[in-house]
From Swiss-Prot:
Full protein name: Large ribosomal subunit protein uL11
Family listed: Belongs to the universal ribosomal protein uL11 family.
One GO biological process term: translation
Keyword field: Methylation, Ribonucleoprotein, Ribosomal protein, RNA-binding, rRNA-binding
InterPro entries: Ribosomal_uL11, Ribosomal_uL11_bac-typ, Ribosomal_uL11_C, Ribosomal_uL11_C_sf, Ribosomal_uL11_N, Ribosomal_uL11_N_sf
GO molecular function: large ribosomal subunit rRNA binding; structural constituent of ribosome
Entry keyword annotation includes Mitochondrion: no
Modification(s) after translation: One or more lysine residues are methylated.
Function: Forms part of the ribosomal stalk which helps the ribosome interact with GTP-bound translation factors.
PANTHER family membership: 60S RIBOSOMAL PROTEIN L12 (PTHR11661), LARGE RIBOSOMAL SUBUNIT PROTEIN UL11M (PTHR11661:SF1)
Record's subunit section: Part of the ribosomal stalk of the 50S ribosomal subunit. Interacts with L10 and the large rRNA to form the base of the stalk. L10 forms an elongated spine to which L12 dimers bind in a sequential fashion forming a multimeric L10(L12)X complex.
GO cellular component term, pick one: cytosolic large ribosomal subunit
Length: 140
């Protein structure tokens, strides 16, 4: 028989840098999960992408064991990395902070495809372009 699930925890953690400090410690502590065990497993799984923000969904079971699934980094993080900017524009319609080529947008869309609910690559590209526009990044 399958284990009884007691909760799901969604977090965004820098890859390879999970530690018991907030926000991870309190979120896992509420569910009685072994925090260090999660940190070691997460850091081992994500050490290749160290420093990149990585969403993770942790499934907690009744016996206090857990499993976790890492997802692809959020689109704004990928856009900032590709455009080489620190943050988006405070007024995106007036102040543009960077530029992305169609090829870069396509690359980001391919990376995010497993986590997006887009039917095609073109739809995923439009999603990425919309996010870029709202950050003040031009698509050329």
């Amino acid at each position: 028989m399958a284990k009884k699930i007691t909760g799901y925890i969604k977090l965004q953690v820098p890859a390879g840098k999970a530690n018991p400090a907030p926000p991870i410690g309190p979120a896992l502590g509420q569910h009685g999960v072994n925090i260090m065990e999660f940190c070691k497993a997460f850091n081992a799984k994500t050490q290749a992408d160290e420093g990149t923000i990585t969403p993770v969904v942790i499934t907690v079971y009744a016996d206090r064991s857990f499993t976790f699934i890492t997802k692809t980094p959020p689109v704004p993080v990928l856009i900032k990395k590709a455009a080489g900017i620190a943050s988006g524009s405070a007024v995106p319609n007036k102040t543009k902070v960077g530029k992305l080529t169609k090829a870069q947008v396509e690359e980001i869309a391919k990376t995010k495809m497993p986590d997006l609910n887009a039917a095609s690559l073109e739809a995923a590209m439009r999603t990425v372009e919309g996010t870029a526009r709202s950050m003040g990044v031009d698509i050329v």
